[in-house]
Amino acid sequence: MEESKTKRKEDRIDLKNTPPQKKSKRDSTNDETARTSLRSIMPRGYKMMENMGYKEGETLGSNESALKEPIKVEINTKRRGIRAEKPDPSTMNDMQMSEQRFIKRESEMKNNKRLKKIWYRIQKVAFEMMGDSDLYNPGEDPRDFNVLWRSYVMQLNEEVAKNDLNNHSNNDNEDKNNMIPMVNESLEASPAIKGEKFGRPSTLIDCDTSIIGSRITKDTELAELEELSIEKRITKLNIFLRSEKYYCFFCGIKYKDEGDLYEHCPGVNEDDHK
């Protein structure tokens, strides 16, 4: 017991006699650099500045409101990085909002592409089930068909026109390749017809202007349909197929009659079939 008491007394005496802790080398160097003048920090640079007309205490340059000393370099003594502090909450909110808008826009674009594919497919089904595929002739006026799948007929006409152009260009290339090169002597004009100019014969193409005029005029019925959203157009055409052919596009089944349709089909919309 006595030995432990004596040890405690000795420890207390040592704590009293211990000198205060010294500052670290980094802190001492920072204090020294803060106290020292510009002349001692950069002697060569200071001499160059004196030669250029600088005097200690005066401004740098001719402007009176200019700096009197160069910008001091603040030494970062923290262990964190330069931008490792907590971000501003206002900027974080803006970043989150922009990210949410981007995700929403991407999902809307994907859904719109998916609905366009469904709209094309249901138009094709109606075009074939109603027998218009047997009556259709390439280049026919789309207004002769039902407005619910009229845009599908227009796409068919565009595809036929593109194929015709491609075939025509391929035939022209084949004709050019098969042409026999003429001898230069045969290209020389005879003395009797030298000096005469021959114009290229103009070709007249007969066309029915009534058909062109009918196609140029605006299709108001189709414009009214396209004002509706794609979901409403799909629903409208599906209702038409259900009433006319007892067929549900989302079921993919042609029912026997109206009773069989309403008994087994869950609904008109796509969401009803999920």
From Swiss-Prot:
It comes from the Eukaryota. GO terms for molecular function: nucleic acid binding. It is found in: Cytoplasm; Nucleus. InterPro entries: DUF4187, G_patch_dom, GPATCH11. The keyword Amino-acid biosynthesis does not apply. Residues 41-87 form the G-patch domain. Residues 1-15 have a biased composition (Basic and acidic residues). The keyword Cytoplasm applies. Pfam families: DUF4187, G-patch. GO terms for cellular component: cytoplasm; kinetochore; nucleus. Residues 1-40 are annotated as: Disordered. Keywords: Cytoplasm, Nucleus. PANTHER family: G PATCH DOMAIN-CONTAINING PROTEIN 11. Present with 1470 molecules/cell in log phase SD medium. This is Uncharacterized protein YLR271W. The lineage of its organism: Eukaryota, Fungi, Dikarya, Ascomycota, Saccharomycotina.
